[in-house]
Design a protein with these regions (language model features):
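Short acidic/glycine-rich loops and adjacent helix/strand connectors
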Residues: 3-132
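Single conserved hydrophobic/aromatic residue that forms the stacking wall/gate
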Residues: 1-2, 129, 133-147
């Protein structure tokens, strides 16, 4: 079975994961920046981007090691491409494209909002009609069944 690598750097968490067969999350490594931004009362985009630079490679390495997967078994690299903080997204997308090129596999850009929706269906992918709302984004989507 082949694996997909996922990278997320859209705001203040740096994350990497390996997924098998589309739904089975084999490993997930996350570094949060909550303490880093606490004194400012919110996320500072420049600080977030620089923190991603420091933490992304260790998160990718940890996800691969925890999964016990050889890089040759990874068949695609997916990464959040938006919406999000531009500098933070650039860190993730640059790393993901570099890995895809190095490993000779496709790069897959992922919409951050749709990824939240898909995550809700990892255990029960039946009805995919959903609305996602938060204080700064709203989106209504209907995702076709993968079955």
């Amino acid at each position: 079975m082949l694996f997909r690598s996922g990278i997320e750097t859209s705001c203040d968490e740096t994350a990497a994961a390996l997924v098998m067969g589309g739904y089975d999350v084999v490993s997930s490594a996350v570094s949060t920046q909550v303490d880093l931004h606490a004194e400012f009362g919110g996320v500072v985009p420049e600080i977030a981007g620089r923190a991603h630079l420091d933490m992304l490679n260790p998160m990718i390495a940890r996800a691969i090691v925890e999964a016990g997967v050889q890089e040759s078994r990874i068949d695609a690299v997916a990464c959040t491409v938006g919406p999000g903080l531009v500098g933070a997204l650039l860190v993730g997308v640059s790393a993901a494209k570099a890995l895809a090129l190095t490993w000779g596999v496709p790069f897959v850009g992922v919409n951050h909002m749709e990824a939240h929706l898909y995550a809700a269906f990892l255990e029960d992918p039946t009805d995919r009609k959903s609305t996602r709302l938060n204080s700064s984004h709203s989106q209504q989507s209907r995702m076709p069944s993968s079955a």
